Amino acid sequence: GGQYIFITNNSSKSVNDYVEKVTKMGIRAGYENFYTSSQATAMYINENYPDQVVYCMGTRSLVNELREAGISVVTEVDDRASVVLIGFDTENTSEKIRNTCIMLGRNVVYLATNPDFVCPVSFGYIPDCGSMSIMLKNATGKEPFFIGKPEPIMVNCVLKKLGMKAEDAVIIGDRLYTDIKTGVKAGVDTICVLSGEATTQDIEEGDVKPTYVFDSVKEIYEGLTEA
């Protein structure tokens, strides 16, 4: 059988949170089956800005993930911080936003975990990290460098982790501007499922084209079992 990893841009939760979530859904998965934008961000900071203090506007899970990776993290205005990082912060407050604007007024590196505009919830959608970055741009004029999808960083890390070549992998997702685009950038075949955000019209009219299109993950499974 093949290998699989869930790649998520959601930096608001820990890997353990995701393992628990999919287990409740009846899906067998362990820690090794997930790779998050939080993990990718920690790796990116350690490789590009080692030993620097990072100001983070994010959830406690994101802050803990960074600290566990050996990164010095502050969550208040701090003169030592040379890197500002924002994530999908479901614990956000007006004070956090104010502090982030203060920090962005300084000569700092500005990073963000992911460019997603919205996150699906039970009643519809809520603003994700991409929307928060637009809000901060309107206030400060600053734009971040995004770590997660559609940048190929996460995919390249996963391929290396699995010891797999790009031509032997496929990315499945429902968002053209993150899931599918990251596959295109990483040189990996893609499958767009129409059970989420993307529609047939989006694919026809958009610049990002998936390799394959299926109505749902179930249809992919049925196709594989029949093969």
Regions found by a protein language model. Give the residues of each.
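Conserved phosphoryl-transfer catalytic core
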Residues: 2
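Asp-based, Mg2+/Mn2+-dependent phosphohydrolase catalytic module
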Residues: 11-35, 42-227
